[in-house]
Amino acid sequence: MEYNFQEIEKRVQGQWRKDKVYRVAEDTSKKPFYVLDMFPYPSGAGLHVGHPLGYIASDIFSRYKRLRGFNVLHPMGYDAFGLPAEQYAIQTGQHPEKTTEENTARYREQLDKIGFSYDWEREIRTCDPNYYKWTQWAFLKMFDSYYCNQAQQARPISELIEVFARQGNEGLNVACGEGVRFTAEEWTAMSEKEQQEILMNYRLAYLGDTMVNWCPALGTVLANDEVKDGVSERGGHPVEQKKMRQWCLRVSAYAERLLHDLETLDWTESLKETQRNWIGRSEGAEMEFRLAGKDCTFTIFTTRADTIFGVTFMVLAPESELVEEVTTEEQRAAVETYLTETKRRTERERISDKRVSGVFSGSYAINPLTGKEIPIWISDYVLAGYGTGAIMAVPAHDTRDFAFARHFDLPIVQVVVPEGETATDPATWEDAKDSKSGIMVNSDFLNGLSVEDAIAQTKEYIREKHLGCVKVNYRLRDAIFSRQRYWGEPFPIYYKEGMPHALDEDRLPLRLPEVDKFLPTESGEPPLGRATGWHTAEGYPYELSTMPGFAGSSAYYLRYMDPQNDTALVSRSANEYWRHVDLYIGGTEHATGHLIYSRFWNKFLFDLGIVCEAEPFRKLVNQGMIQGRSNFVYRIKNTNTFVSYGLREQYEVTPLHVDVNIVSNDQLDIDRFRAWRPEYASAEFILEDGKYICGWAIEKMSKSMFNVVNPDDIIARYGADTLRLYEMFLGPLEQSKPWDTNGIDGVHRFLKKFWALYYNADGIRVTDTAPTKEELKSLHKLIKKVGQDIESFSFNTSIPAFMICVNELTAAKTTSRAILCPLLTVLSPFAPHITEWLWQELGVEGSIVTATWPEYNEEYLVESCVRYPVSFNGKVRFNIELPADMSKKDVEQAALTAPEAARWLEGKSPKKVIVVPGRIVNVVV
């Protein structure tokens, strides 16, 4: 019987579904292990061969852990809300729910074909009301909570209200926005609306004025990763910075815990460092500067208060509320022009772009230590969300300040002389001087002190003179949590007299209403403004914004633990059994988004006692990217003529991506190209040697680059087991690598050779013959190697090990059941279909999924013979095989008396013979 992968995979997958072999439940007799993939957004394009890379790796690990006796939770679902579905709905008029349903069905079909061991009874979709009920519930809990810095946990807002009634808010150590001080009497005298406005400064979910990436064409706020080069990633529409009132989550309250608990996680150091930098803890001082000629002060945060004598100008972020205050009439037109320009740039662009720009406000500040006036400038290299949105510029010791001072011809004063140097004229410098260590100069009472001593003395001086306070600051911002879009979770909020009120929990889920269009209303309201009856039974209007894409993905891992629970996000018993995700696999692009928000969300639920562990993901593995091999055609400018790759330098050409499916070995199928797109129907070609040769490049696999390879095509030609093995064979999991089918035939031939160990023309060839010592050695060597590889995620090195073992067993004409049954178990995590089929054909009871991983025996791994390379004067001339326990003297004698040795000795006696036991023999003649 030949290896018929189509029949095998169809039957095996049907059997798995029928027997529900991947269904999992809490089983206290088994140790739990939770393996999770970052769930996909179901796009209309479906999966390409790059998507399953991490899924295959996690599936191998899950299957291995089951074989090791663990109770494995390995679920899958869909991150189904989001902008792409909404944009498609706007373009086609189709409801996002319909297209999302079609897309998820397509994804499910593709995932099933690859043979993943998912428990589909636990499937979740973020757009399902039964799921987003718990996203809304968590939001309400945050709305009704504040953060106590002293207790380092979230507490009910009702407790804070009681404190306000007793003592006001003086001296409270809690997380809050900018707020006024008030006594208990003043609190009691406030109206309900005034009290609610005060509480908004303390709630963990709050309404606040914040700078956002606003896209007028899309009518919505965009996250930083949805904007590129000043335009929306989807559609290429202009994006501007705009201050808007938005729902926010007070993620910054958890900054210290998010930072500290990184040390408890088994993540790569590079990923931890990315989060540390994003959280951005810095110790420094807040100092007050007075505006010259005005009874007004403003605060700056600095980590280097000791350099205050080197301050020669101040800089405000363009979004700072102080800009209006400090701008003089003479400078107003210039300032307004500059503000308009900066609105077009996102924060990321401002951080990465080194171009110098700015405008003088016309006003001056007073240096609190020197009393000197210093000019106040406005520049987009200062960000409103970090510190106070205002900085004191020390150009001698900060690269961006230095560039700014040089560009606008502002003074530069050196205040730190690096160790081993002498003070020099800054006019001769090419860049700022390092100030991390050295001796203070030009700094009044700090002169002669080391930097370390100067920092301590300056902080003490600031405290004594009441010029400010010592403070720890974080770069981490609160998360903007509302979007002016349709396809997202509705907020469980209604408005009464303009103030937000929480919907009662028993009225959840608040379902997304129907609308006639998915665009903003004519008056500029979000799409939900089009909904009929979008208000409470009492007539109070609901919130019109929806939640962002990360809302549904922030706690989805918990819902998988208990997906059918109608009364809780997750029961205490289910959470205490599964506890956390033991292995999480996904891309590095989520390091500063999803992974921060999920950790925050989990810590909040931990504070409430909903979950039993403070961290959601114990071990995190980032898979690399499978890149596409793109092809290009070269169109001569202003023509419809295409020139072959080797002749392109003779013309002025524009390279264009072409569908890789109409290219073979870089040769274009001209007829298929003309049929590919209407504009190419009349295309002309300049060929080389009668062929049109395309250019190529290794790029991200993307529909827009026409380099997508559909896994369905690979499965149809080679089978799912070949695809699974080949994706692992391409290279280390964590590295990016190009997709190249040159090696896939070899992997497919391996499976045929593996099949031939079990089947021949007459049928099953497996017997009860006792295994030989060499067969046992081959098997146990493989068991050890593959087990170690899986534990270390070195899946790529397992594939050659399988090939070597099968070659050895084929050469030995192995038929022994004692060898071939365990071999099936070891290969089954990688190639589950062929191994399941053969397992059943051999009459073994149950599914191979529930088999037991074989233990290797060290006795079989001891080498009885050693192959020695024999060198003469350093060059290997021949090899000899000798017993492993042979003495050095006997090895030397065997090498010198071997028939091949005479040729290289030439009748001479060796000057020296070096024997490295078990390794090499070197003869010096």
From Swiss-Prot:
Q: Which residues bind ATP?
A: 703
Q: Name one GO molecular function term.
A: ATP binding
The record ties this protein, via Pfam families, to: Anticodon_1 (PF08264), tRNA-synt_1_2 (PF13603), tRNA-synt_1g (PF09334)
Entry similarity comment:
Belongs to the class-I aminoacyl-tRNA synthetase family.
Keyword list (alphabetical) reads: Aminoacyl-tRNA synthetase, ATP-binding, Cytoplasm, Ligase, Nucleotide-binding, Protein biosynthesis
Name of the top EC class for this enzyme: ligase
Catalytic reactions of this protein: tRNA(Leu) + L-leucine + ATP = L-leucyl-tRNA(Leu) + AMP + diphosphate
Where located? Answer: Cytoplasm
What gene is this protein translated from? Answer: leuS
Principal localisation: cytoplasm
Per UniProt, the short sequence motif 'HIGH' region occupies residue numbers 40-51
Matching SUPFAM superfamilies, A to Z?
A: Anticodon-binding domain of a subclass of class I aminoacyl-tRNA synthetases, Nucleotidylyl transferase, ValRS/IleRS/LeuRS editing domain
Q: Where is this motif: 'KMSKS' region?
A: 700-704
Q: Look up the record and give one Gene Ontology term from the biological process aspect.
A: leucyl-tRNA aminoacylation
Q: Does the keyword Ribosomal protein apply?
A: no
What GO cellular-component annotations does this UniProt entry give? cytosol
Q: What is this protein called?
A: Leucine--tRNA ligase
- In short, the EC number is 6.1.1.4
